[in-house]
Amino acid sequence: MNIFADFDTRIKNALETLDLVKENREKVDFSRITVESPRDLSHGDVATNAAMVLAKPLGTNPRALAELLVPALQADGDVDGVNVAGPGFINLKVSVGYWQRLLADMIGQGVDFGRSTVGAGQKINVEYVSANPTGPMHVGHCRGAVVGDTLANLLAFAGYGVTKEYYINDAGSQIDVLARSVFLRYREALGEDIGSIPSGLYPGDYLVPVGQALADEYGIKLRAMPEEKWLPIVKDKAIDAMMVMIREDLALLNVRHDVFFSERTLHEGNGGPILSAINDLTFKGHVYKGTLPPPKGELPDDWEDREQTLFRSTEVGDDMDRALMKSDGSYTYFAADVAYFKNKFDRGFSEMIYVLGADHGGYVKRLEAVARAVSEGKSKLTVLLCQLVKLFRDGEPVKMSKRSGDFVTLRDVVDEVGRDPVRFMMLYRKNSEPLDFDFAKVTEQSKDNPVFYVQYAHARCKSIFRQAQEAFPGLAPSAEDMAASVALISDINELQLVAKLAEYPRLIESAALSHEPHRLAFYLYDLAGSFHGHWNKGKDHQELRFINDKNRELSIARLGLVNAVANVLKSGLTLLGADAPDEMR
């Protein structure tokens, strides 16, 4: 049950009973009403702006409307009190019985508590990582991988039909460079002295096994071929090897995609899919022949002072028109982007989410223009830009590159601190804000280390169940047993913990709808703090302890509360791609 959705319905039903509303029903818009937690929890459990947004169309002032609504709200048996604050905000105090029933519902739903149908099966494509297949994942890829993967998990939990996608950039000039770099390692594997790696090729040792694999499979055959013969063979082998490496790196972060889409497929059949996309835009009136003025600053590779086939993107929100086909008939990189979006649209996605690095900020408007033109407004495009991650150790900056010139890899970071700290901390700032990652801090066993603090809360929940078995040998209450005992949960501290848990369904929906997965990390930290705080009170006040060895039934009821906390923590950590340990080791 979503307490805020529930009281949204109750408040609207109460409004419908007012004569003033009945007489002016066509003038009021209930969709503007919000129901949320009050900023000051001492004011109540639920707050609404109903009187503030409806007073003007009803020809009255907010406070007068609020006072008029109070008796109708007080008639609700689950409302213990109503007060009007300031100019007309309404705060409601929820009854103990309501919290108890809500707790029973949480216990019954288990880890599915918070699951939503708000997405109604709407198909969403989330594309993230999409690193060039030219080497291992470096630490700069971590943030986009975690943001995209967690957002996709949230959207699925909120009822959307989600596809996690990786776009393989395997058609650009960098792939030729990769193939020539691998061929050099192939020659090395055959026993040649290749000397130092020439400038412009990839120097990393990660290509040595790829060259050796080619030598094992082909012997000296490739060496005897002209470049136009061996290049496509080596390209295929190199891309396959790089994608195996990338998949393994991502698996270390618990990141797995449903679809790996190859850019090369867009160029098959002389670029048939790209031409089809251009023809589609032409049919819709978005393509013309012309020349583009030189852009300010450094000229891009695809600019030329000749007539080209252009996308009239300024008419759909872009800053300038974009070239689709050069004067020689070859396609631009942007044309492939258009074809890729059309492919997604043709697959039936109503929203496409691109998770990109901050250096792609200049692409946002052109991608949005493509979405408007191709889908004719039927499909939404959202771009999330991830700012840089800076590495620290004990507060001191860590160089992002090694002595060899290679970047610190994703594997380096996960091997040192573990998967869960990386996943959690990559979400502990909004994606649009820079993030500092301190190797020392994320391995601390303290409140200052969010992932430890949250996982420790789950482990502590499980330890309470073990303590219960020590106090009451053989005690293993079922969910039904615990739910049946919730009437014994009445202490204000316990009810405040239930109220914190009750925020979870709203949190899931808001984080999914706003595309802000960091909200989940913040919520879990707050929930862990509430739980640890209540546990600590039990050290000084025996009557607040979760296990009362003289009262079996009360202990079972409180185990139900602990169970609900554990389930929400496990649910949230799972969505984050992290473990919920039963014990901290």
From Swiss-Prot:
GO terms for biological process: arginyl-tRNA aminoacylation. Its EC number is 6.1.1.19. It comes from the Bacteria. Keywords: Aminoacyl-tRNA synthetase, ATP-binding, Cytoplasm, Ligase, Nucleotide-binding, Protein biosynthesis. PROSITE patterns: AA_TRNA_LIGASE_I. It is found in: Cytoplasm. Pfam families: Arg_tRNA_synt_N (PF03485), DALR_1 (PF05746), tRNA-synt_1d (PF00750). InterPro entries: aa-tRNA-synth_I_CS (IPR001412), Arg-tRNA-ligase (IPR001278), Arg-tRNA-synth_N (IPR005148), Arg-tRNA-synth_N_sf (IPR036695), ArgRS_core (IPR035684), DALR_anticod-bd (IPR008909), Rossmann-like_a/b/a_fold (IPR014729), tRNAsynth_Ia_anticodon-bd (IPR009080). A motif ('HIGH' region) lies at residues 131-141. It catalyses: tRNA(Arg) + L-arginine + ATP = L-arginyl-tRNA(Arg) + AMP + diphosphate. Its main location: cytoplasm. One of its GO terms (molecular function) is ATP binding. GO terms for cellular component: cytoplasm. Belongs to the class-I aminoacyl-tRNA synthetase family. Monomer. This is Arginine--tRNA ligase. It comes from Agrobacterium fabrum (strain C58 / ATCC 33970) (Agrobacterium tumefaciens (strain C58)). The lineage of its organism: Bacteria, Pseudomonadati, Pseudomonadota, Alphaproteobacteria, Hyphomicrobiales. The gene is argS.
